[in-house]
Amino acid sequence: MATSMLGSVPGPRPFGLAGLFRRRPPRDPWERVRRLPRLSAVRRSVAAASGPGIPDSHLYCLELLRKRDYESYLCSLLFPAECQRSASALRAFNVELAQVKDSVSEKTIGLMRMQFWRKAVEDMFCDNPPHQPVAMELWKAVKRHNLTKRWLLRIIDEREKNLDDKAYRSIRELETYAENTQSSLLYLTLEVLGVKDVHADHAASHIGKAQGIVTCLRATPYHSSRRQVFLPMDVCVQHGVSQEDFLRRNQDKNVRDVVYDIASQAHLHLKHARSFHSRVPAEAFPAFLQTVSLEDYLKKIQRVDFDIFHPSLQQKNTLLPLSLYIQSWRKRY
C-alpha cells in the first residue's frame, strides 16, 4: 500500500504533543491564540491612524489575504510587530499575481496585468509606485527593508510563463516553478526579517519547492472540475495514468501511486529543509510557519491512502491557528 511506503521513509521530527511539553507551555494556548489581533481590531487602529474617509492600503492587503490566502493571513499575525505590515504586503502581492490566471478569459489580458506589475515594480524602485493598494504597500516594504528587485521580477516572470494552461512536463519543471515563485517569496520574507544567512536560504529553497508541490496537489480537484490537469506528466506516464483518469476522478491504485510519488517529493523537501534547523537563525523562523499547513496536508493525504479527491482534504483545519501559535512559540519549522 502507498501508505506503508511513505511510513517506511524516515520522516521529519515528531510533531506530537509529547515533544512539546518538554518545555513549559503556556497554561492555555487557546488563550494566546485568542489574543492574536483580529481584523476588526486592525481596522479600528487603522481608521484611527488614517483619519475618516482615507482608504488604507495595509487594511486592503489584510482583507485580500483573509479572503484569498487565509493561511498566510494567520502567519502574518505571528511575525514580529515591526515586520507584519511588510510581510502581509509581500503575500498580498503574491495573491494578486496568483489570481490573474483564474480571473482572465484570454491570455492577452493576463499578459497585460503581468506587465502592469512588472512596470509597478520598476516604478517602486524609482519612488513612483502606482496608486494601487498592494503596490503602495509593497513600495513601503521595498523602502523599509531594501528588498531585492530581482526576486520580485522573477516571481512575475514565472507567473507569466504559467499563464499557458499546460501540465508540467516533469516534477523538475514543477520544482523550478516553485523555486522561482514560492522560494523567491521566502527570500524576500527573510529580507523583511533582516536575515542574511546561507542556511536560511537553503531551507527557504526547499520549503518553497514543497509549497509549490503541495499547492499543485491541493488544487487538483478544483482544476479537474474545470477539465484541467497540471500534475507532472512524467510521473503520470511512469504509472500509466492519463489526464482523463484525473478528470473522471479515478481512484485506481496507479492514480494513487502518482499522487504518492508527487507528495513524497514534497515530504522530501520538508525533510531537507529541517536538516538545516540547528544552523538557521531563530529570527528566520516566522518566514517558515507555512510548514505547519504543508505537513498537515501531507499527513491528511497519507491517511486517506493518497486519494487526492477525498472530501476530507477540502475541509479547513480549525486547529490551524493553535498549531501555528504552538510552532511559533516552540521556534521550530
From Swiss-Prot:
What InterPro entries would the database entry show? Isoprenoid_synthase_dom_sf (IPR008949), Squ/phyt_synthse (IPR002060)
Q: List the subcellular locations.
A: Mitochondrion inner membrane
Q: Which GO terms describe its cellular component?
A: mitochondrial inner membrane; mitochondrion
Q: What is its main location?
A: mitochondrion
What UniProt keywords apply to this chain's record, in alphabetical order? Membrane, Mitochondrion, Mitochondrion inner membrane, Transit peptide
A Pfam family found in this protein is SQS_PSY
Entry keyword annotation includes ATP-binding: no
Instruction: Return one Gene Ontology term, BP aspect.
Output: mitochondrial respiratory chain complex I assembly
The chain's transit peptide is found over: 1-44
Q: Does the keyword Glycoprotein apply?
A: no
- Family statement: Belongs to the NDUFAF6 family.
Q: What is this protein called?
A: NADH dehydrogenase (ubiquinone) complex I, assembly factor 6
State the gene name recorded for this protein: Ndufaf6
